[in-house]
UniProtKB/Swiss-Prot annotation:
Paired cysteines (S-S): none
Subunit structure: Homodimer.
Species the sequence originates in: Chlorobium phaeovibrioides (strain DSM 265 / 1930) (Prosthecochloris vibrioformis (strain DSM 265))
EC number: 2.8.1.6
Xref: Pfam families: BATS, Radical_SAM
Lineage of the organism: Bacteria, Pseudomonadati, Chlorobiota, Chlorobiia, Chlorobiales
GO terms, molecular function: 2 iron, 2 sulfur cluster binding; 4 iron, 4 sulfur cluster binding; biotin synthase activity; iron ion binding
Domain of life of the native organism: Bacteria
GO terms classed as biological process: biotin biosynthetic process
Listed NCBIfam families: bioB
Recorded family membership: Belongs to the radical SAM superfamily. Biotin synthase family.
Protein name as catalogued: Biotin synthase
Matching InterPro entries: Aldolase_TIM, BATS_dom, Biotin_synth/BioAB, Biotin_synthase, Elp3/MiaA/NifB-like_rSAM, rSAM
Length: 332
């Protein structure tokens, strides 16, 4: 490609392809401001960067909602918050056999990472429920040794972060959701963003790989999205899941406006240029909102996705996603 035909800001960003070094905040802000007509040029660059500097292949993971609803936090997008009024199934922490059944199904469909997710604030200290989760992790390691076991169980303290590391957790997910300075206004004010960031730091000190990303479509600006990407870089996270809001009836964001497709493409491309070596996953919104365009996101810098369903909304069939991955391989 003759980069002289590109917008100058995109042409300058081709430096990432040659060096593997990320773009600066100023460059990201300029690229974020470009009109939608340049989104595909940006996506093309991001895909090339992914192929040259990414981890290689397509990284699929699946999660299980192991404890649902009655969460005391007031996250505005979440169906599980007791502050909201969504119609969802509510249940306490499931038993080990139920977890093993779901995990085995994922492994049989070629999914390499399986995550246990629980509703609620988290586990700053050891308690009986947290010890049950540790036992589940041990059981999965014993029964399915080839499966990478992950967890997303909220805010942690030093004791619980160290325990998860000892029990061999592969990745821990806790999302920033938005730029740190916008968290209280756009997401929740029953807890602070610093608690989430400190959880990431605790886990990194214990040597645990962290999966940490955000959600778009909750009222943030494009500048806010860029700020979130750079906050993630400062936290040294290895996997970045990006969710697109799926409005759920009974939540404050049930009538939120959809994010333009060109902006979604731009966010994924910028994520790759800010994080050339990380795994960038497309999570919520892939099937329901992107529909025919979900493959485009996987060619805009993403190299992974969440498969098989989400916490309170349905996803796509595991077998369909397995075929999807095989077809995407021809672009690598």
């Amino acid at each position: 490609m003759d980069i002289k035909t590109l917008h100058p800001a995109i042409a300058a960003a081709y430096r990432v392809l040659e060096t593997g070094e990320p773009i600066s905040l100023e460059e990201a802000e300029l690229l974020a401001s470009l009109p939608g007509e340049f989104s595909l040029d940006l996506a093309s660059l991001a895909n090339k960067v992914r192929n040259r500097w990414g981890k290689g292949g397509i990284h699929a993971c699946s999660i299980m909602n192991a404890k649902s609803g009655v969460c005391g936090e007031n996250c505005r997008f979440c169906a599980q918050s007791r502050h909201n009024h969504a119609d969802i199934e509510v249940y306490p922490l499931v038993d080990e056999d139920a977890v093993l059944f779901e995990a085995r199904s994922c492994a049989e469909h070629g999914v390499s990472h399986f995550g246990l997710v629980t509703s609620g604030y988290g586990y700053r200290t050891m308690n009986a429920e947290f010890k049950r989760i540790l036992a589940m992790i041990d059981r999965l390691h014993e029964e399915l040794p080839e499966l990478n076991v992950c967890a997303s169980i909220g805010i942690l303290g030093p004791e619980t972060a160290a325990a998860l590391a000892r029990h061999g957790i592969a990745h821990y997910n806790i999302n920033l959701q938005v730029a740190p300075e916008k968290y209280a206004g756009l997401i929740a004010d029953t807890h602070g963003i610093e608690e989430r960031m400190e959880t990431v730091r605790l886990l990194r000190r214990e040597g645990v790989n962290v999966c940490c990303g955000g959600i778009i479509g909750v009222g943030e600006s494009m500048e806010d999205r860029v700020a979130m990407l750079f906050a993630l870089r400062d936290l040294d996270v290895s996997v970045i899941p990006i969710n697109v809001l799926v409005p759920i009836e009974g939540t404050p964001l049930q009538a939120a406006e959809s994010v333009p497709l060109a902006d979604i493409v731009k966010v994924f491309a910028l994520a790759r240029l800010v994080h050339p070596h990380s795994i960038i996953k497309f999570a919520a919104g892939r099937e329901t909102l992107m529909k025919d365009f979900q493959g485009l996101l996987m060619l805009s810098g993403a190299d992974g996705y969440l498969t098989g369903g989400y916490l309170t909304t349905r996803g796509r069939d595991l077998a369909d996603d397995q075929r999807f991955s095989e077809r995407l391989a021809s672009f690598s």
